[in-house]
């Protein structure tokens, strides 16, 4: 009987961590994110297990274990972050996993009220701030804001080095930041498509006009495509 009474707080802490983690994960699942209901529930429960285990073996070590949990969640969060060109996806999901671990730590320490309050705030951040961010994105872009561009240039395979140098000179002259430069075989045999990822001011017309005006200076270029990165 005494053993059951000792087990009850342990189980209660784990159940609270699982339920609150699942509540956070339900919002992620609803939005079809990679880390959904089960992942967040398991992260919160796992964090609570580590805290409870540390309190059992050494009551003075929960703070040290909590720091180790934060480090461990960093590796887990990195697994849901994907880079597609210049776009990075999964940051919100990774941050939510980190928050779920924090909820688990609070539940492991028996701070249920704090854990519930933190869960509500996390849900508000994921739901309400999402709408606010979408409204802000719909506002007119400031001329001083940065914008991402994709510049694709097609040339003969033999002229790739010369065209790359030409692109570097253009970037330097236009005073824009080059984030990435690579090449892939073009659709036509014997040709290369060079892709430059650029970051500059939202008022891109001057940069575009400069690039277009310089196309005639390079006979090695057979095609060029300029676009704004939508992400």
Swiss-Prot record:
Q: Which residues form a coiled coil?
A: none
- Transmembrane intervals: 5-25, 39-59, 62-82, 103-123
Q: Is this entry keyworded Cell inner membrane?
A: yes
> Which compartments does it reside in?
Cell inner membrane
**What membrane topology does the annotation report for this chain?**
Multi-pass membrane protein
Q: Where does this protein chiefly localize? A: membrane
Spell out the GO cellular component terms annotated for this protein, sorted alphabetically and separated by semicolons.
Answer: plasma membrane
- Please provide the record's keywords in A-Z order: Cell inner membrane, Cell membrane, Membrane, Transmembrane, Transmembrane helix, Virulence
Q: Name the PANTHER family for this protein.
A: PROTEIN MGTC
Please state which protein family the record places this protein in: Belongs to the MgtC/SapB family.
Its biological purpose is as follows: Virulence factor required for growth in low Mg(2+) medium and for intramacrophage survival. May be involved in regulating membrane potential by activating Na(+)/K(+)-ATPase.
Name of the protein described by the UniProt record:
Protein MgtC
Organism lineage string: Bacteria, Pseudomonadati, Pseudomonadota, Gammaproteobacteria, Enterobacterales
